[in-house]
């Protein structure tokens, strides 16, 4: 008899068939309490859980006594109570490698779009404001040869450093929990403390997960240390930044502009002051959002769950200690 799983994300037919070859699959639209109650027997017997974005917490786990593995279609997992899973000896699988290059492309795009004011001037053209040769009021700033500061030198940070160093001749500074010798050797990246990075970088790019230590790591003090000509990019997690402090820094001219893929509350409120600022490029958490990469993430998550329920957790496991 096949193990049973709960699937709370729509998958392409070929990936769904791959799951069904190994498991009895119950598809649900979400993990809301009413959904769990409606499918109580399926949740109670499920050994696997696969999907994205929904909260996986102790209350849900209480309804899933047979659960052995959860697989998220993402690299981040701040919506999952990992400690609760580990205490139950439930492994959590994620998809860290398949989205690296695509997210780095997104960060680079935010840097270019923000510095060259692409969105702002494109909207002005559409509004009929381009009636003569443009002057300084339409100008942006250069990206090439400017100093890039990367906060979080993981896979994505490395891919961004590669683009900046080889493609744009940018000196690279970085701050991370530990020094990254490969970054220093390949890209001549310079490790420094956060204050130094903020003071010297022309672009401050944040690529951090959300943890107790990183929540509101960037606030009024940090923005005050940045150059008034600096551009701030956040492509990690929204709550790493105190959004009110960022808004104030932009309004007061403490920094030049911001390119934001993530926000404290998502979707971003239509009343957010960020949406009325011409020096802000705000996009809806599109970091990995290409057809190719999202498919690859789903395929990776499917394979992760198949492997995990066969006891294979050598790669992509967040909490391997749970298997002990």
UniProtKB/Swiss-Prot annotation:
Superkingdom, taxonomy of origin: Bacteria
Record's keyword annotation contains Cytoplasm: yes
Organism lineage string: Bacteria, Pseudomonadati, Pseudomonadota, Gammaproteobacteria, Enterobacterales
Organism, as annotated: Salmonella agona (strain SL483)
Subcellular location: Cytoplasm
Family: Belongs to the D-isomer specific 2-hydroxyacid dehydrogenase family. GhrB subfamily.
Name listed for the protein in its UniProt record: Glyoxylate/hydroxypyruvate reductase B
GO cellular component terms given for this protein: cytosol; plasma membrane
HAMAP family (alphabetical): 2_Hacid_dh_C_GhrB
Protein EC: 1.1.1.79, 1.1.1.81
Pfam families the UniProt entry points to: 2-Hacid_dh (PF00389), 2-Hacid_dh_C (PF02826)
Subunit and interaction comment: Homodimer.
Keywords: Cytoplasm, NAD, NADP, Oxidoreductase
GO MF: glyoxylate reductase (NADPH) activity; hydroxypyruvate reductase (NADH) activity; hydroxypyruvate reductase (NADPH) activity; NAD binding
Role: Catalyzes the NADPH-dependent reduction of glyoxylate and hydroxypyruvate into glycolate and glycerate, respectively.
Catalyzed chemical reaction(s): glycolate + NADP(+) = glyoxylate + NADPH + H(+); (R)-glycerate + NAD(+) = 3-hydroxypyruvate + NADH + H(+); (R)-glycerate + NADP(+) = 3-hydroxypyruvate + NADPH + H(+)
UniProt gene name: ghrB
Residue numbers annotated as active site: 237, 266, 285
